[in-house]
UniProtKB/Swiss-Prot annotation:
Cellular localization per UniProt: Nucleus
Function in brief: Sequence-specific transcription factor which is part of a developmental regulatory system that provides cells with specific positional identities on the anterior-posterior axis.
Domain of life of the native organism: Eukaryota
Similarity remark: Belongs to the Abd-B homeobox family.
CDD domains xref list: homeodomain
Name of this protein: Homeobox protein Hox-C12b
DNA-binding region: 215-274
Keywords (A to Z) from UniProt: Developmental protein, DNA-binding, Homeobox, Nucleus, Transcription, Transcription regulation
Any one GO MF annotation of this record: sequence-specific double-stranded DNA binding
Amino acid sequence: MGEHNLFNPGFVGQLVNINARDAFYLSNFRASGGQLAGLQTLRLSRRDNVCSLPWNPSEACSGYPQSHISGPVTLNHTYNQSCDITRQEDNKCFYSDSACATSGGGDNNSTNLISKEGALDNSSVSITAENGQNNLNGMDNGGSYSKYDCLTPAEQPIPNPRLCRSLESVSGCSFINEGAKTSSGITHSLTSPDIQTSVAALNGGALWYPMHRQTRKKRKPYSKLQLNELEGEFILNEFITRQRRRELSDRLNLTDQQVKIWFQNRRMKKKRLLMREQALSYF
């Protein structure tokens, strides 16, 4: 870097607050002895003319480098104004778990800001891609957009585990159970045998499982021997007694109910024949 001489180009760049009419053109200076002898006659009356404000190295302005000024540079008051503008812009607050990180808080805060700005840049690219896809989907669905299409991932609603647990505990309520009962009743009614038999009849097929229905017993016809015995007993006595009915049932291998029904039917048949004969006699 060299000696900290007043006329060294690297050292002159650190002087900040100089009047606008005072300008140093560093390209005119050379390392010859005559020029140095001439420059030594220049004297500064007071330090206030050189720098009116004390310089704080911790509040360095990142917009302008302080070392290695190669060309002719004019230092004036606009330099401090630009520093104030950049300080106002950098004085932002990023909320974190521990504290509020600002730009003037030191090296740790500046590194946190740089990392967060990089993360925001990367997330902005992904967010724009996702929003573009969501917009395309919304236009395909007729231009309807959902509630959370334009939100960033940090602004998306997070499900509350306590609310989820409360909903799970409320799942045993009466109205939910009633809804489950009604749905189960509907499915049970749809799977009833009557509906399935009708569906099978419409489809022209048969069910693979037997029907659980009380079917009527198949009519068992009487044999000729049984009919002859019953006809002979009917000719002798139309109204048979209980004792005689038991004897016939035991002898003909029939039940008491069958013998009783046969005599009832036979009496009705005889009555119809008599009514027919009477009707034919009138004509």
